[in-house]
Amino acid sequence: MLAFNAATSIGAVAVAMNAHWQADEMAYGLQDSGAKVLIADQERLDRVAACSDLPGLQVLAVRPSKPLAAGVRNLADLTSAVGDVPMPPVDIQPDHPATILYTSGSTGHPKGVLSSHRNIISALMSWELDRFIGEKVTGIVPPAPAIQPGTLLAVPLFHVTGLHASYLAGFRAQRRLVAMYRWDVEEAARLIDHHQLSSMIGPAAVTGDLLRLAQAGKYSLTSLQVLGGGGAPRAPEQVRQIGKSFTQALPGTGWGMTETNAIGCGIGGQDYLDRPASSGRSAVVLDLRVIDDAGVPLPTGERGELLVRGTSLFQGYWNR
């Protein structure tokens, strides 16, 4: 997270690599993106050591547990040597590139999705705008929280759900963030209770794990208010059970893509409980249209190809 903030703050492009990638996949991502600096933990350092043909790549180690290979430097040593200095002035414009996130394509290697600062900020502000509109329409405004809200980061930061919806959205919401190294439902429940966290986002398998633990009654989980989802549809029965099994947590979900910077449509609370098979309404900053094979718009309820337009849409596929 600090590396991401640092890179985007100086006008560099942050390339988030899949943590599960092996040596050949890492080599592809590094070569395709043209990355100049790799910031990696020991597991990733071991993998990249097997990569060849990465000329000019500077490697910075985070929490290394082994002697560093030739040319690899410890990030902690570098930052401590610099000390506390002011940030240099940097000219960053809204349409300058900010991130490359790799997404699996229909064929071949994953494609790098290039997004600008404007694209990402538009997505983050869209969630906030959708919430304000919902409060205006329903007349229901949540009371001010007794303690600072907090979210459990239980999904990867190389995915827009983790990076945008969990991490970056927390800045405007002034949420605390508690991160897990990998998913463990018992540890997740312990962290939620210990830190009195109010929200978590995860795919159906993850929220299903937490639901079963809540039903077992081993943990309190009374602080949890929102149990968000995405990435794959939930079974309607899981939606209903979330509404019944937590003290105050309500389910939420949505549809989005890496290419839309996570936004698309969304639904939550009682609306979702009433319509558990729905993905919700369109984000207000997007135009959605369903067309047939000839490009003709289809009426509501018909299946077809989905077109999306809006300011959060990416700049293009890198090197494509």
Regions found by a protein language model. Name each.
Residues 275, 289-307:
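Conserved beta-loop-beta connector loops within the AMP-binding
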Residues 98-126:
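Conserved AMP-binding A3 loop
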Residues 121-150, 154, 158-198, 213:
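Conserved AMP-binding/adenylation subdomain of ANL enzymes
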